[in-house]
Each structure stands twice: as structure tokens, then as C-alpha cells.
């Protein structure tokens, strides 16, 4: 298997990546925001989406014009398919069908399921632990736990940038700085940008969300080892300000209980 630095260099340059790879995202749209310019460079890609994209709270669904969580989830799945077509990406796909915003209570199960599908993968790429979204953090934890279970057989862990809080504001498509894990940014071609712009537009139900991101920005790095019993590296959690019942302190307690 190529070294982590070599993989990062290939991601930055847009070179083909032949190593069997698993990308774990929390929701339909995360793959496009975080890795959309590079998904078509993987020749052996398994895309795993942890949630169905539909919270039990109907606020998001109703705001997008849907009368049920089921209809909203189906619409988001269709949007993801259209986005992948726009990106010229042809991964194998699995959805674990966890309820959106509920991954914290399924960390252990997610890790166990990942062990089964990581056995033949050389690389795994997911969200960082940065307090941007509770499902993102749960994905980061599940991957770290799964790789710990696999030991010497574990794939190389990488991350794509999502969003976090710094100085009281949301910072998107950039990592919280970690000197031990410097980030790289891709050289995006005109075709890359055109495909990703079309993929952004495929997520019609998520137009408000997508407006916080730019198609021309991505960043990747080797994943550090996180201590999930402590607050994420930025300290403050962005999702504490979303008005949701789940707060970051509760997240750590429930994630630890779920992980066993």
C-alpha cells in the first residue's frame, strides 16, 4: 500500500487512486461537499452513508416541502444518486439507515459494521472530530474504533474537511489546525469545478445547507488519534448553537455508552 503522504499527494494532484477505499459520510451531500472533486479518481470505491438524511424532528423535512420523514429520506437518496452521476463517480454504495442526528447512539454498532466492510480496504476516509455536527463526530469515532479492532490489518485513516467553530463563527471546508496532521488542498480543474457545481445543484432540498459551502474548496489530511472523552480540538462545538436537544457534553456521554 502507498504511504499516507503519497495518497495525499495523489488526492491533491487528482491522480488515479487504485487502492481499495471506503469513504464513510454521515449524510447524503457530505460526499459531494468533502470529496466531490476526487470521488471519480478512485478505481475501487465503497461509499457508505451512515444515515438516511432524515431527522425524526420534521422541521427539516417540512422546510423542504415534505410531509413525512420517509419521503424526505427518499428524496435525499435520489439527490445523492444524481450528484454522484454529475461527479462521474461510480462507487459501490451502502447506507446504514441510521436516523439523522442519532448516530451518537449507534457508534458501537457502526464500528462493528465497519469492521466487516473494511476487511478488504486499504484506505478509509471520513469526517474529522471537530464538533461541527454530532453525526460527523460519530463517524470519526466509529472509524477509529473499527480500525482499532482491526489492529495491524486496519486501513490507513484519512479525513476530509467539513466545518467547525472558531472565534464564535462557523469555519467551513478547512480543518482545525493540527501540526501533526497538515492538510493538503487539491488543484481543481475546470472540469472538476463544473462537475462539482452540478452536483451541488442536485441537492435541491439542501439548498440552504449547500449555500454555506463552495464547490471550489476541499482539504484532506491523515487522521489523528482522537480522545473522544474530551471536547473536540476546537474546544467549542458548533452544534451546541443549533438549538438541538443534543449538546456536546451529552454527546460524549452517550457515545461512550454506545461504544461500550
Predicted segments — roles?
Residues 1-159, 198, 202, 216-218, ...:
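Active-site beta-strand->loop->alpha-helix modules in alpha/beta enzyme cores, enriched
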Residues 18, 128, 140, 163-168, ...:
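Bulky hydrophobic/aromatic packing residues
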Residues 151-177:
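Short, flexible loop segments at boundaries between secondary-structure elements
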Residues 167-229:
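A conserved mid-domain beta-alpha-beta active-site/ligand-binding segment of alpha/beta enzyme cores
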Residues 207-260:
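C-terminal and late-domain segments of enzyme folds
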Amino acid at each position: 500500500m502507498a504511504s499516507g503522504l503519497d495518497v495525499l499527494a495523489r488526492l491533491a494532484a487528482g491522480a488515479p487512486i487504485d487502492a481499495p477505499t471506503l469513504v464513510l459520510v454521515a449524510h447524503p451531500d457530505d460526499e459531494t461537499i468533502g470529496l466531490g472533486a476526487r470521488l471519480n479518481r478512485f478505481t475501487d470505491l465503497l461509499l457508505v452513508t451512515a444515515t438516511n438524511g432524515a431527522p425524526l424532528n420534521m422541521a427539516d423535512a417540512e422546510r423542504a416541502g415534505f410531509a413525512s420523514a420517509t419521503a424526505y429520506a427518499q428524496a435525499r437518496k435520489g439527490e445523492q444518486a444524481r450528484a454522484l452521476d454529475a461527479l462521474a463517480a461510480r462507487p459501490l454504495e451502502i447506507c446504514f439507515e441510521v436516523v439523522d442526528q442519532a448516530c451518537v447512539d449507534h457508534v458501537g454498532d457502526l464500528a462493528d459494521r465497519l469492521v466487516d466492510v473494511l476487511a478488504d480496504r486499504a484506505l478509509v476516509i471520513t469526517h474529522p472530530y471537530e464538533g461541527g455536527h454530532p453525526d460527523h463526530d460519530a463517524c470519526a469515532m466509529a472509524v477509529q474504533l473499527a480500525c482499532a479492532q482491526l489492529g495491524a490489518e486496519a486501513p490507513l485513516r484519512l479525513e476530509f474537511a467539513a466545518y467547525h467553530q472558531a472565534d464564535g463563527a462557523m469555519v467551513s471546508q478547512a480543518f482545525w489546525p493540527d501540526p501533526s496532521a497538515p492538510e493538503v488542498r487539491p488543484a481543481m480543474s475546470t472540469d472538476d469545478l463544473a462537475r462539482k457545481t452540478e452536483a451541488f445543484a442536485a441537492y435541491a432540498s439542501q439548498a440552504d445547507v449547500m449555500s454555506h459551502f463552495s464547490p471550489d474548496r476541499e482539504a484532506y489530511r491523515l487522521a489523528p488519534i482522537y480522545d473522544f472523552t474530551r471536547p473536540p480540538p476546537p474546544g467549542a462545538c458548533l452544534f451546541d448553537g443549533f438549538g438541538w436537544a443534543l449538546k456536546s457534553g451529552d454527546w460524549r456521554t452517550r457515545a461512550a455508552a454506545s461504544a461500550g
